Amino acid sequence: MQASIESTGNLERRLTFTLPQERLETHVGGRLRELARTTRIKGFRPGKVPTKVIEQRFGQQVRAEAMEGLLRETFDSAVREHSLRLAGNPRIDQGESDFDFVATFEVVPDFGDIDVTNLSVVRHTAEVTDADIDQMIENLRLQRRTWNPVERGAQVGDLVALETWSQAGNERLPAEGVETGSSVLGSGVMFDQIEKGLEGLSKGEDKALSIDFPADWRVPQLAGKTVQVHVKAVEVSEPVLPEVNKEFIKSFGVKSGDAEQFRADIRTNLERELKGALMNRLRREVGEQLIAAYAHVEMPPRLVENEARSMLAQQVDQMRRSGRNPGEIPADAHQGFMDAAAKRVLVGLLVGEVARRNELRLESKRVSETLRLIASTYEEPEQVIEMYRNDPQLMSGLRSRVMEEQVIDWIAERAKHTEQSLSFQDAIRV
């Protein structure tokens, strides 16, 4: 194989290589002959289609597919030959001829000796108690509550139907009439100042409130301004919670309506949630320790920039989903995420290095257990499992997640660690 490697930066490499033309032609010829034997074309007997006809119909597609496969195979072979470990995907450009290519990519930095025994990790523990199950049942009752109109002043927990209009300087919103809506006091859906202002209002009463809107508020006319918000309580209703009886229990999928089975199912769900929360805490603990120990190692610039752009895109998407206006995104907006992105990249590369150096292998049993755990949160678990198994992208993401968890556990077991007990509520709190 003709291939040469050169350094174009501390962590950037340029690989120039040539595809073996004979192998390409051999592959194309073999594929065309195979198609000639199996393709049915009107006017020709099966297996008797002339090669020229097959080439006219399929030659361009077959050659493109063969070129793509051989390009990938040749590049991978050159990477192995030069003992390169890529950080991210390469950019491959055409060279001087049809068979010459130039690949530019970044490599994993040299972390030196990775000694995880010097790390200090706090490993949190927690368990689901009967009180946690009681609280969850109370939350489920709140989900199924009905509302009873009352004549008294509004209290936390009440549902208030309201009318509002706002005055921002000389501008009234809406220009005419009022906006209508409703909110449960104490839910945090509205501004805290508005919720506090609604407390004590009875049906038909109104009040003017001075509210400071954040600069990124979804309504441009209000964003970053101090606004007079006029609110009127149209109706005040108190919650009526359902009894925990057989009908209530059956509504949550427990066909027998048995209270003990209901509590057992809730315990299973809470323990699943707790397991994920404790792993996330451990992931953060290990990540922070790795960052502190290896912050001096230079990260691949392009990989960090791509991660920063991905983080920006996620934030913009979250803002839009929550109704906030992200506004016009400057071309360099991702720069504000560069530090966080560098830390993410550092942890990701270190986790990969620990797995490689210690020959850690993906545990298929753990993959199956995790998949069953994910599927158990849906009404049709078997369909979810089948969906994953038939989707290579979903399975790849699942395997990556499980492998990362294996490495995190491996590091935590060998690091200096202390245990800290938490309540269930504290453990799941972000």
UniProtKB/Swiss-Prot annotation:
NCBIfam families: tig. It comes from Xanthomonas campestris pv. campestris (strain B100). One of its GO terms (molecular function) is protein folding chaperone. It comes from the Bacteria. Transmembrane segments: none annotated. It holds the Pfam family Trigger_N. This is Trigger factor. GO terms for cellular component: cytoplasm. It catalyses: [protein]-peptidylproline (omega=180) = [protein]-peptidylproline (omega=0).
